[in-house]
Amino acid sequence: MTLLALGINHKTAPVSLRERVSFSPDKLDQALDSLLAQPMVQGGVVLSTCNRTELYLSVEERDDLQEALIRWLCDYHNLNEDDLRNSLYWHQDNDAVSHLMRVASGLDSLVLGEPQILGQVKKAFADSQKGHMKASELERMFQKSFSVAKRVRTETDIGASAVSVAFAACTLARQIFESLSTVTVLLVGAGETIELVARHLREHKVQKMIIANRTRERAQILADEVGAEVIALSDIDERLREADIIISSTASPLPIIGKGMVERALKSRRNQPMLLVDIAVPRDVEPEVGKLANAYLYSVDDLQSIISHNLAQRKAAAVEAETIVAQEASEFMAWLRAQSASETIRDYRSQAEQVRDELTAKALAALEQGGDAQTIMQDLAWKLTNRLIHAPTKSLQQAARDGDNERLNILRDSLGLE
């Protein structure tokens, strides 16, 4: 049995190829069935995200293994093998285990240390268990990877610092306000960055969210997801006073929030402080707002400096994380190698027990028939000894005849002979 990890990711393939190799969720069962129908595949997990498509497999070793799996992947996606081959990576046994642990821990992600990948790996594993997981070694590898990812996040600072604009904006808000459970946040825009911000805020149980956007339909979809209120951009002037935090990211060519608008809001708030995070380019908030007392304005450049500092911290933490992964992968492979001997040990013990039971039964029968106990016990001991050493003796004799000193030494060591 061999463990494999093969696939492509953001480092080896452009999005034009990644999208062709991805597995759609509604056809994943079909893909897994097709994969497990391959004669060499004993168990499989398919991980398919926007940044990677990977197969984690337990397989029987054979000469054409790599060619057969590449052929299956290309046939399934109607790809030319040459298109895929140059972008494909292939990891086996210890390298496969290390790769999965690195992926689950966020060490192989586009954003170093990002936590979302662990959930994606867990979902891929759960999907594979719906009648598809057949290899206990593969299952154990995934379970171990989950615990390693948890250890990495617990013992290092890999996820402690924000390295995305959206996460940095939320981190800044949480640093300034002791708790988000008592604040109102106004989000201006409804694009991808604001979507991420809204989800981060929901996770931190913000008291209230208001989304202002040019088109209500797009904002309403996000609002329904995070439990927010939707308003028009034209309503910002009137509603700004309610917001303790304003995070803005639109594509407007001109500022949406001006100095006068913020002055009026601060006056209505009796000068309670406002945090404004402008992550738009061009800027959504007039720079002069930052000169107002109790208005704390941060631009995307301010966040980038935070991100750069935090990324350096993450890279330092990643060195610690890599050490953990190397150690855990080595220990897992040692466990796996030990398991490969378990079946042999069970068979050997079972064989010895059968000999014992057979000869003991004959000895007891002889005793019941009135035979001499000492003679019967000596006969039992002699037969038991001969039966148990018969196979090892033959192996030793054959090794000697073959002149195989290495095998002789291994057998001597196995039998506990000095």
Swiss-Prot record:
Residue numbers marked as site, Important for activity: 99
GO MF annotations, alphabetized: glutamyl-tRNA reductase activity; NADP binding
Pathway: Porphyrin-containing compound metabolism; protoporphyrin-IX biosynthesis; 5-aminolevulinate from L-glutamyl-tRNA(Glu): step 1/2
Binding residues for substrate: 49-52, 109, 114-116, 120
PROSITE patterns listed in its UniProt record: GLUTR
InterPro entries: 4pyrrol_synth_GluRdtase (IPR000343), 4pyrrol_synth_GluRdtase_dimer (IPR015896), 4pyrrol_synth_GluRdtase_N (IPR015895), GluRdtase_CS (IPR018214), GluRdtase_dimer_dom_sf (IPR036453), GluRdtase_N_sf (IPR036343), NAD(P)-bd_dom_sf (IPR036291), Shikm_DH/Glu-tRNA_Rdtase (IPR006151)
Enzyme Commission identifier(s): 1.2.1.70
Organism: Escherichia coli O45:K1 (strain S88 / ExPEC)
Keyword entries, A-Z: NADP, Oxidoreductase, Porphyrin biosynthesis
Binding-site list for NADP(+): 189-194
Domain of life: Bacteria
Family, as annotated: Belongs to the glutamyl-tRNA reductase family.
Enzyme class: oxidoreductase
Protein name per the record: Glutamyl-tRNA reductase
Keyword NADP in annotation: yes
Recorded name of the encoding gene: hemA
Catalysed conversion reaction: (S)-4-amino-5-oxopentanoate + tRNA(Glu) + NADP(+) = L-glutamyl-tRNA(Glu) + NADPH + H(+)
Additional facts recorded: During catalysis, the active site Cys acts as a nucleophile attacking the alpha-carbonyl group of tRNA-bound glutamate with the formation of a thioester intermediate between enzyme and glutamate, and the concomitant release of tRNA(Glu). The thioester intermediate is finally reduced by direct hydride transfer from NADPH, to form the product GSA.
